Amino acid sequence: MTHLAYGPGGNDDPSVHAAAAKAVELIMDGARVGLGSGRAVRVFIEKLGARRREGLRVTGVTASQASTREAKRAGIPLIELGEGGPLDLTVDGADEVAPNLDLLKGRGGAMVRERIVAAASASQVIIVGEEKLVRALGERGRVPVEVIPFAEWPAMRDLEALGLAPTRRLEPSGSRPLITENGNLIVDCALSEPMVDGRTARELERALLAIVGVVDTGLFLGTADRVIVGHYDGHAENRLTVK
């Protein structure tokens, strides 16, 4: 299977700006907001910081050290998870979005903390550019799996037994394994073919989580309440989950 490169999604991408701007409109005065990680969230944090300077009262909980730095730079006060009760909503990005709004995440390596922050929120809002929409999860990339280092060998064996092609993720320099903020490894698993439907994705998720040493996966299935899709012409649309 050929893995296509992920789309631009950078700070200058008009589709990302459109999605982030629409997400900021959802933030009510006094809200406690979960801040995921990644390039789209970085743009959202910048825009949320601008609204705070205009007088919007808001506090945040971040899912990664990178988002902590961005939030502090934007002037967004940060609180501890659980401080003051549940979060009103979490805004995060995704690497792939299926038609049923199932997600594939984890390219940034912060998926465990992203899931924790989302679970502490009343709703999860995902912001993406239109290039992240796929017909089936796994169409554009591998499935990330976070693994405890001591369990690397048996976990790799069991991942291969599922018909996956696992590869330990390296730091950008390529000289050593990437270590998550939880002290674990990321193993990127190539699929023989995309997951044709939600049932297939859920079967894979169950099989992955049953492997000893696997902490979490990049499959976020049924977690998104709203996906905001930005387009290159500057407009954005809401896609809501029917629950």
PLM regions and their residue ranges:
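N-terminal glycine-/serine-/threonine-rich phosphate-binding loop
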Residues: 1-89
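Conserved phosphate- and dinucleotide-binding cores of soluble alpha/beta proteins
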Residues: 2-14, 65-243
